[in-house]
């Protein structure tokens, strides 16, 4: 039971004297024992003990970036795919392009997402989230991009 207590105290930074150290030889007098117990003991600094532990800092990871793009032509779809290849999710706003161009962009992005094993999700009428395989898309969206109801230009 005392070993568990010693481990907890050592982890917190307080060290207890081992019982073996308390046992003194018969040759020493009691006065010497009292003087030794009053002397400060060297305790290993907490900072040096932490370097021995294998603890990973949670905040050491780099920041996660989400790219927001508003393509103006079909040629801008390549830039969206380049971000996907570098494992960055992209929010694509297709509100400024014609419906035929928007359809081509979504088709191109759908093929790219399939090839890269990612996902694509519709957020609103003209806004889509395109994510690589290392990003999960979660939330209450209006619908997946399956069917003619999602694409009004497919009437």
From Swiss-Prot:
UniProt name for this protein: Cell division protein SepF
Main localisation: cytoplasm
Entry's Gene Ontology BP terms: division septum assembly; FtsZ-dependent cytokinesis
Region Disordered: start-end pairs: 16-44
Disulfide bond sites: none
InterPro entries for this protein: Cell_div_SepF, Cell_div_SepF/SepF-rel, SepF-like_sf
Family indicated by similarity: Belongs to the SepF family.
Pfam families to which the protein is assigned, alphabetical: SepF
Keyword Cell division set for record: yes
Subcellular location field: Cytoplasm
Gene (UniProt): sepF
Species, as recorded: Acetivibrio thermocellus (strain ATCC 27405 / DSM 1237 / JCM 9322 / NBRC 103400 / NCIMB 10682 / NRRL B-4536 / VPI 7372)
Role of this protein: Cell division protein that is part of the divisome complex and is recruited early to the Z-ring. Probably stimulates Z-ring formation, perhaps through the cross-linking of FtsZ protofilaments. Its function overlaps with FtsA.
UniProt superkingdom: Bacteria
Key words, A-Z: Cell cycle, Cell division, Cytoplasm, Septation
GO cellular component, one term: cytoplasm
Biased composition (Acidic residues): 16-35
Subunit composition and interactions: Homodimer. Interacts with FtsZ.
């Amino acid at each position: 039971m005392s070993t568990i207590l010693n481990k907890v105290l050592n982890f917190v930074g307080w060290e207890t004297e081992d019982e073996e150290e308390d046992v003194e030889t018969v040759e020493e007098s009691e006065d010497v024992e009292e003087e030794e117990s009053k002397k400060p003991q060297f305790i290993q600094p907490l900072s040096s003990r932490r370097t021995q532990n294998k603890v990973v800092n949670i905040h050491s990871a780099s920041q996660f970036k989400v790219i927001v793009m508003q393509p103006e032509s079909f040629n801008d779809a390549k830039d969206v795919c380049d971000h996907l290849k570098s494992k960055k999710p992209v929010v694509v706003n297709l509100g400024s392009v014609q419906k035929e161009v928007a359809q081509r962009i979504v088709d191109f992005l759908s093929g790219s997402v399939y090839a890269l094993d990612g996902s694509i999700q519709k957020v609103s009428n003209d806004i889509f989230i395109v994510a690589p395989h290392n990003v999960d898309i979660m939330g209450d969206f209006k619908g997946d991009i399956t069917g003619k109801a999602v694409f009004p230009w497919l009437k």
